[in-house]
Amino acid sequence: MPQYFAIIGKKDNPVYEIEFTNAENPQGFPQDLKELNPFILHASLDIVEDLQWQINPTSQLNGNGGNGSNGGGGFLRSRAVNNTDNCYLGKVDHFYGLAITAYISYSGMKFVMIHGNSANSSVVIDDNNMRSFYQEVHELYVKTLMNPFYKITDPIRSPAFDSRVRTLARKHLSK
């Protein structure tokens, strides 16, 4: 099952892009779909930004504090019960059998992935593995931000970053 992953900046600029393939499908997405992937991903950003500002219904019901319980706007809507997981938005969109998942940082960086399928069946996403993948890639991104020679708007071209993201994909996405 191929996946196309991107980190999108605050101004909807791509900061990092990569396609993951597996042994079953080493070519990844078909060529015509490879060209459409950035457009599909950017089309889903509107949904991600809408979800970003929705009030978290669990914090409103449970009175867990935060913006949701006092009637103000919430920062991140999530299916998560605790506040540590509320950056992971889960499946936010679909496009002709492709699922799109998202994670958004508190600084407004969007981590978005298109999940392809190897057959004409619907894509099944393991939320726990996806959440772990996004959280670990976010940690790598934060470490990249700590580099004094990196500007937040520049694309990430580090081979070390790329290698670590590929390792995380093998660890979390190939299950």
From Swiss-Prot:
Fetch the SUPFAM superfamilies from UniProt: SNARE-like
Q: Where in the cell is it found?
A: Golgi apparatus, cis-Golgi network; Endoplasmic reticulum; Preautophagosomal structure
State any GO BP term from the record. Answer: intra-Golgi vesicle-mediated transport
Q: Which Pfam families match?
A: Sedlin_N
Q: Kindly give the Gene3D superfamilies that the UniProt entry links to this protein.
A: 3.30.450.70
Superkingdom of origin: Eukaryota
Q: Which UniProt keywords apply?
A: Autophagy, Endoplasmic reticulum, ER-Golgi transport, Golgi apparatus, Transport
User: Which cellular component, as a GO term, is one annotated location?
Assistant: cytosol
Q: How does the record describe its quaternary structure?
A: Part of the multisubunit TRAPP (transport protein particle) I complex composed of BET3, BET5, TRS20, TRS23, TRS31 and TRS33. Part of the multisubunit TRAPP (transport protein particle) II complex composed of BET3, BET5, TRS20, TRS23, TRS31, TRS33, TRS65, TRS85, TRS120 and TRS130. Part of the multisubunit TRAPP (transport protein particle) III complex composed of BET3, BET5, TRS20, TRS23, TRS31, TRS33 and TRS85.
Q: What role does it play?
A: Component of the TRAPP I, TRAPP II and TRAPP III complexes which act as guanine nucleotide exchange factors (GEF) for YPT1. TRAPP I plays a key role in the late stages of endoplasmic reticulum to Golgi traffic. TRAPP II plays a role in intra-Golgi transport. TRAPP III plays a role in autophagosome formation.
Give additional notes from the record.
Present with 1200 molecules/cell in log phase SD medium.
Q: Which family does it belong to?
A: Belongs to the TRAPP small subunits family. Sedlin subfamily.
Recorded hits in PANTHER family, A to Z, give: TRAFFICKING PROTEIN PARTICLE COMPLEX SUBUNIT 2
By what name is this protein known?
Answer: Trafficking protein particle complex subunit 20
**Source organism:** Saccharomyces cerevisiae (strain ATCC 204508 / S288c) (Baker's yeast)
